[in-house]
Amino acid sequence: MSAVRSKICGITRIEDALAAVEAGADAIGLVFYAKSPRSVNVLQARAIIAALPPFVTTVGLFVNASRCELNETLDAVPLDMLQFHGDETPDECESYQRPYIKALRVKSGDDIAAACAAYSGARGILLDTYVEGVPGGTGEAFDWSLIPPGLSKPIILAGGLTPTNVGAAIEQVQPYAVDVSGGVEQGKGIKDHSKIRAFMQAVRNSSGAM
């Protein structure tokens, strides 16, 4: 099995971003959603990105943002990729002409294969836990058996992942990447560096990376 990629999401501090990179994370996620306790503003995001070494992917997470709001952020912050975590349509996601990930909140009866096909321009599909009225960051895992095999897009597994369960998640789902936020925190938006290291070690152990 090839090495599973990883993103540490909900970064709000420079020191947490650097800890994620030092532990081996491929990407960091910055949340531009004011209702989230992990949200950052433009100045915070710029400072975090400026502190990063080369070859670390920066992902901006948006939830049903207005076109004006999103364009203002894109003009001010050098993001590598967008993550749409709301009800954005394929056309809306495509309209920004940036590489993007589309998040789906998984519940029983969902046709994940059809959603992958609908968002054909996405670089990957992120699968998260469905909780009514909550767009993400619930800290709860979902039933991984709901994910069908042979999906047409790289799958990024999220939703309640921790250092203790990510190994089992990788073994069962065999995703392209894993995404964690609350599972490596000591408080909302404040990362626990030892948990980040433990999470990344579990990812390496499970994916066979050297």
UniProtKB/Swiss-Prot annotation:
Fetch the NCBIfam families from UniProt.
Answer: PRK01222.1-4, PRK01222.1-6
Using the UniProt record, name the top-level EC class of this enzyme in a single word. isomerase
The UniProt catalytic activity note for this protein reads:
N-(5-phospho-beta-D-ribosyl)anthranilate = 1-(2-carboxyphenylamino)-1-deoxy-D-ribulose 5-phosphate
List the keywords (alphabetical): Amino-acid biosynthesis, Aromatic amino acid biosynthesis, Isomerase, Tryptophan biosynthesis
Q: GO molecular function terms here?
A: phosphoribosylanthranilate isomerase activity
What domain of life does the native source organism fall in? Bacteria
Sorted alphabetically, which Pfam families does this protein's record hold? PRAI (PF00697)
Matching entries from InterPro entries are given as: Aldolase_TIM, PRAI_dom, RibuloseP-bd_barrel, TrpF_fam
Which protein is depicted? N-(5'-phosphoribosyl)anthranilate isomerase
Which pathway does the protein contribute to?
Answer: Amino-acid biosynthesis; L-tryptophan biosynthesis; L-tryptophan from chorismate: step 3/5
Entry EC number(s): 5.3.1.24
| UniProt record similarity statement | Belongs to the TrpF family.
Q: Which residues form the signal peptide?
A: none
